[in-house]
Curated annotation (Swiss-Prot):
Required for replication in 'nonpermissive' cells, including primary T-cells, macrophages and certain T-cell lines, but is dispensable for replication in 'permissive' cell lines, such as 293T cells. In nonpermissive cells, Vif-defective viruses can produce virions, but they fail to complete reverse transcription and cannot successfully infect new cells. The keyword Phosphoprotein applies. It is a peripheral membrane protein. A motif (BC-box-like motif) lies at residues 147-156. A motif (HCCH motif) lies at residues 110-141. Induction: Expressed late during infection in a Rev-dependent manner. It comes from Human immunodeficiency virus type 2 subtype A (isolate SBLISY) (HIV-2). Keywords: AIDS, Host cell membrane, Host cytoplasm, Host membrane, Host-virus interaction, Membrane, Phosphoprotein, Ubl conjugation, Ubl conjugation pathway, Virion. This is Virion infectivity factor.
Length: 215
């Protein structure tokens, strides 16, 4: 029996540019702010049996499960796309795995990483007390219908200037800008900022936005 070539097709998301921004932001949040300290980062490497290279970012999640985001380069040389990149997002646990979309990946990451509103924040907002928490991953809530409590807390977080010190919000925005700035720079720029203290409670803009995924 003549055996032809067997193909295994998996869904990937094409990205318009190089992956330095994604890799730099992951390293910044892993080694500088420690928000992703438990995440495993595997730099770009050549796959021995294939013609493409791959990098991996593995997020340990609750319930002994993991989310893995793989970045591929040079997947389709026969079409001349030698500099094209794509990513694959996979959730897996023991004995089961499935591919997920970027919005689902945001929800999975936020279930374990980055701070969010605490349970008592609604009561504090009703009593007019100072807010003690905020959501550093708002993109993770956009894939589902938000509750009235969450919408109210977002409004309080954005507009409640007389009741809370703006230091937290300024630091939040500063962390966000610093993260994206470092994501655009190379390793030399990281060394020049080695004397700066690490920022706490970093803001994460979302998987699709960082990778600039083309739907």
């Amino acid at each position: 029996m003549d055996q032809g070539k067997r193909w295994i097709a998996v869904p990937t998301w094409r990205v318009p540019g190089r992956m330095e921004k994604w890799h730099s932001l992951i390293k910044y949040l892993k080694y500088r702010t420690k928000d992703l300290e438990q995440v495993r980062y595997v730099p770009h490497h050549k796959v021995g049996w294939a013609w493409w290279t791959c990098s991996r970012v593995i997020f340990p999640l609750k319930g002994n499960s993991h989310l893995e985001i793989q970045a591929y380069w040079n997947l389709t040389p026969e079409k001349g796309w030698l500099s094209s990149y794509s990513v694959r997002m996979t959730w897996y646990s023991e004995g089961f795995w499935t591919d997920v979309t970027p919005d689902c990946a945001d929800t999975l990451i936020h279930s374990t990483y980055f701070s969010c509103f605490t349970a008592g924040e609604v009561r504090r907002a009703i009593r007019g007390e100072k807010s003690l928490s905020c959501c550093n991953y708002p993109q993770a809530h956009k894939s589902k219908v938000p509750s009235l409590q969450f919408l109210a807390l977002v409004v309080v977080q954005q507009n409640d200037k007389p009741q809370r010190d703006n230091t937290t919000r300024k630091q939040w925005r500063r962390n966000y800008r610093r993260g994206l700035r470092l994501a655009r720079q190379d390793g030399r720029s990281h060394k020049q900022r080695g004397s700066e203290p690490p920022a706490q409670g970093a803001y994460f803009p979302g998987v699709a936005k960082v990778l600039e995924i083309l739907a």
